[in-house]
A protein has these predicted regions:
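Juxtamembrane intracellular "pre-TM" segments in multi-pass secondary transporters
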Residues: 17-27, 208-241
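Helix-loop-helix hairpin linking two adjacent transmembrane segments in secondary transporters
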Residues: 122, 151, 160-207
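Helix-to-loop junctions at the C-terminal end of transmembrane segments
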Residues: 84-95, 287-299
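Cytoplasmic helix-loop-helix junction between adjacent transmembrane helices
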Residues: 126-167
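Helix-breaking motifs and short loop linkers at transmembrane-helix boundaries and internal kinks
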Residues: 63, 95, 116-122, 150, ...
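Conserved MFS/SLC helix-loop-helix module at the cytosolic interface between two early adjacent transmembrane helices
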Residues: 82-121
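Paired small-residue
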Residues: 106, 110, 121-130, 324-332
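C-terminal transmembrane helical hairpin of 12-TM major facilitator-type secondary transporters
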Residues: 301-344
Length: 363
């Protein structure tokens, strides 16, 4: 099977690109969709990473080791990684918009429930379930964008969603770090859960109904295996999956390493000071939202190479002994990551002709 082929069993289900009712930039539907996508990116990623600045508080409250407290985050991401693949199957049968909304709403409610957990194990169960639910957001959202937004606006729209994830990741870390200075960790979790609950309602009101979605009745396992196999046989998609894996690995490792390095001598920064480094996500918000427009002007390949170059330059700068140089390096890496991530994720949607949620889940 070559990179452009698709299973014959799906040929009757494909919607002609020429006959699709695309959402175009400048319309009311596009404006509503852009705001809704920003909200879903913010809510999902703030719920994932909100516990990171709370780990010391967990250690003290439940009398556990720092290593054990990190399970509050690692369990969430582990269960998200599992459910994100399965979510593509459910959304193909149930519809994109409903799956995203239900996942967001229930995850927000679980975050509120987390503030009432009586012991450590019940908190971990809540966080694991939250990750399981949030798996229904990223891949399905990217599939909705690829199916509903006009191809010429795909990069710009994906950038709005990625900007929301950047803002959510930043506020989940920095915002919660500030809140816990004035309130208990329980109150902080409840407040964020309430905010994300409101975001989920606004998302449902704003996101236009699907126009081009082709429903697949039932949860036919053979169909989904066939789709994943088809995407994994597509060499172009494989390259995009590899880029996504490498980008995320570098980005996550950077912040983990920087936290330990800057907390030790000769910098000896406090946890609050270190958490402020995550404000560099604001560069990601800007770069991801502009990436699509810049790619239209200068070419996608040029912008992706520019993003890679920024990440390499930033990585070299983090080797400096100067604190200022390290912070600038982190800002460069963040900017480059979100440029490349935004363009790569939009390319996955464009390259996958059918079963877009399956391709997005693999990415």
């Amino acid at each position: 099977m070559n990179s452009s082929s698709t299973p014959s069993t799906l040929s009757t289900e494909a919607t002609s690109v020429l006959s699709r009712e695309w959402i175009h930039k400048g319309t009311k539907a596009y404006k509503h969709a852009g705001f809704a996508l920003f909200l879903v990116g913010f809510a999902s990623f703030s719920l994932i990473y909100c516990v990171q600045p709370l780990l010391p508080a967990f250690s003290q409250s439940f009398q556990i080791s720092p290593a054990s407290s990190s399970l509050a985050l690692s369990l969430t991401t582990a269960f998200l990684a599992i459910s994100i693949v399965l979510s593509s199957a459910f959304s193909q049968a149930l519809g994109r918009r409903g799956v995203i909304f239900t996942s967001m709403l229930c995850a927000a409610l679980l975050n509120i429930v987390s503030m009432l957990t009586p012991n450590w194990h019940s908190l971990l169960i809540a966080r694991a379930l939250e990750g399981l639910l949030l798996g229904g957001v990223p891949a399905v959202t990217m599939a909705w964008i690829a199916e509903e937004i006009a191809p010429e606006h795909l990069g710009k729209t994906m950038g709005l969603y990625i900007a929301g994830t950047a803002f959510g990741g930043m506020m989940g870390r920095v915002g919660m770090g500030i809140l816990v200075e004035y309130f208990s960790w329980r109150t902080a979790l409840g407040l964020l859960g309430a905010i994300c609950f409101i975001c989920s309602i606004a998302f449902l009101k704003l996101l236009p109904a699907s126009r081009n979605f082709v429903q697949k009745k039932g949860l036919n396992l053979g169909f989904h295996i066939q789709m994943w196999r088809a995407h994994l046989s597509n060499t172009k998609l494989l390259r995009l999956f590899a880029i996504g894996f490498l980008l995320t690995s570098v980005f996550v490792t950077l912040f983990n390493y920087a936290t330990f390095r800057l907390s030790g001598a000769p910098y000896s920064l406090s946890q609050t000071q270190i958490s402020l480094i995550f404000l560099s996500y604001s560069f990601g918000m800007v770069s991801s939202s502009l990436a699509g427009s810049l790619a239209d002007r200068f070419g996608k390949k040029t912008m992706m190479m520019s993003g890679f170059a920024l990440m390499i330059l930033g990585s070299l700068m983090t080797l400096l002994s100067s604190l200022f140089g390290i912070i600038i390096g982190i800002a460069f890496i963040t900017t480059g990551f979100f440029i490349t991530h935004s363009l790569t994720s939009s390319s996955v949607g464009a390259e996958s002709k059918q079963a877009k949620a399956h391709a997005s889940s693999l990415y």
